[in-house]
């Protein structure tokens, strides 16, 4: 499996630009905030954005929960995923996610340096 990571600070537009990055790199699946997504459809996982606290949100996004990990691992196997884009705020976070869901090491990091109007608020 080819594993890529899109990394950048909060508010840099990672989620917004992920579809373009995936298309440009022939990537069919994306891990974003605890979800495995393909063609804008949720395949597996639970959204970190629905967690009640920032700590819970981060834990969800990095797949700290074994049941959450196993659900996404199973989907990766069942769908025979050949390429995956992991979205994270840092290389360290992306590597933690890759390790938690049991995928190959990340072979390419793509950096999101674009700032949206929300970035100024962070």
List each language-model region with its residue ranges:
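Conserved nucleotide-sensing/catalytic segment adjacent to the nucleotide-binding pocket
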Residues: 30-79
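Post-Walker A helix-loop "phosphate-sensing" segment adjacent to the P-loop in P-loop NTPases
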Residues: 23-31
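Conserved small/polar residues in nucleotide/adenosyl-binding loops
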Residues: 115-122
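ATP-dependent NMP and nucleoside kinases share a basic, alpha-helical "lid"
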Residues: 92-113
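Short, high-confidence coil segments that cap the C-terminus of an alpha-helix
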Residues: 1, 27, 81-82
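Glycine-rich phosphate-binding P-loop
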Residues: 4-21
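Structural recognition of the conserved hydrophobic beta-strand(s) that form the central parallel beta-sheet
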Residues: 84-89
């Amino acid at each position: 499996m080819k594993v890529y990571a899109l990394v950048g600070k909060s508010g840099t537009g990672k989620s917004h630009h992920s579809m373009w990055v995936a298309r440009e790199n022939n990537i069919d699946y994306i891990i974003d905030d605890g979800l495995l997504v393909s063609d804008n459809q949720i395949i597996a996982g639970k959204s970190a954005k629905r967690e009640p606290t920032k700590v819970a949100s981060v834990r969800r996004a990095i797949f700290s929960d074994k049941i959450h990990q196993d659900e996404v691992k199973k989907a990766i196997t069942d769908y025979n995923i050949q390429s995956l884009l992991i979205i994270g705020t840092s290389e360290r976070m992306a590597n933690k996610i890759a390790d938690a869901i049991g995928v190959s090491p990340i072979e390419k990091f793509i950096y999101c340096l674009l700032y949206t109007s929300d970035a100024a608020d962070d």
